[in-house]
Amino acid sequence: MSVEGLLSEVKHFNAHHLDAALGEQLFYGGKRVFSDVKPGTSSGGDHGCKGGKSELKGAIHNAKHAADKALNKEGGEDVSKLREEHSALAKKVDDLASLVAELQLQLSTLRQGQTSSVAAPAAAPAAAKEEAAGDDDFDLFGSEDEEEDEEKKKVVEERLAAYAAKKATKAGPIAKSSVILDVKPWDDETDLGEMEKLVRSIEMDGLVWGGAKLIPIGYGIKKLQIITVIEDLKVSVDDLIEKITGDFEDHVQSVDIVAFNKI
């Protein structure tokens, strides 16, 4: 065999070896799988070439076996991890479902309590309405009573309207008072008849004299008790007494008010 043929065989073997190493680098990220693959030397022509090919095939087979083993191992771990996570998640879901069911039960209980508390006060008005309806059923003369009440109300309103109209057209009432006066003389020698004439001689707007009589005091002395009616806005009792005692001081000692009544 020539030197050129031997170099061609070596170059061909090295090319296969480089392709396998590059595939290993790309797939395993730098991990060495073909650690047992050693470049062979062809010392005997065809024998060296066949030995190198056999070793290359064995290395490729070992690489595939190692790759399948690694993939199966990593996939099993991932599946186990996923199963554990799935179990944990399922447990959490069950716990949440139990919590939601408990909350729904509590909410339903609260709603039932509120419904009963609201229905209790409403029962009283309903009972009152039913009672009133029952009374209406047994009140045979209820409609007549209502008509009578309406008629009475109309009569009262008419009378009030008439009174208001009459009061508007008529002047207001005059405030008057009835006054009883005791007119006392100086002594028993005073002419009581003349004293009465002097008292009655007083004339004022709103003053009307009434009846009079003589009442004994003692020691033969008598006093004159006389009634008068005055209009409160026109006549003052104090002014009247002052006028009697001032104008007739020769006959009159004093004047006292016995009674004072509004008319």
From Swiss-Prot:
Gene Ontology MF: a single term: guanyl-nucleotide exchange factor activity
Pfam families in the record: EF-1_beta_acid, EF1_GNE
GO cellular component terms, semicolon-separated: cytosol; eukaryotic translation elongation factor 1 complex
Record's keyword terms, sorted: Acetylation, Elongation factor, Protein biosynthesis
GO biological process: translational elongation
Biased composition (Acidic residues): 133-150
N-acetylserine modification, residue list: S2
Region: Disordered, residue numbers: 112-153
Cited InterPro entries: eEF-1beta-like_sf, EF-1_beta_acid_region_euk, EF1B_bsu/dsu, EF1B_bsu/dsu_GNE, Transl_elong_EF1B/ribsomal_bS6, Transl_elong_EF1B_B/D_CS
PANTHER family: EF-HAND AND COILED-COIL DOMAIN-CONTAINING FAMILY MEMBER (PTHR11595), ELONGATION FACTOR 1-BETA_1-DELTA 2-RELATED (PTHR11595:SF19)
Family: Belongs to the EF-1-beta/EF-1-delta family.
Subunit field text: EF-1 is composed of 4 subunits: alpha, beta, delta, and gamma.
Task of the protein: EF-1-beta and EF-1-delta stimulate the exchange of GDP bound to EF-1-alpha to GTP.
Protein name stated in the entry: Probable elongation factor 1-beta/1-delta 2
Organism: Caenorhabditis elegans
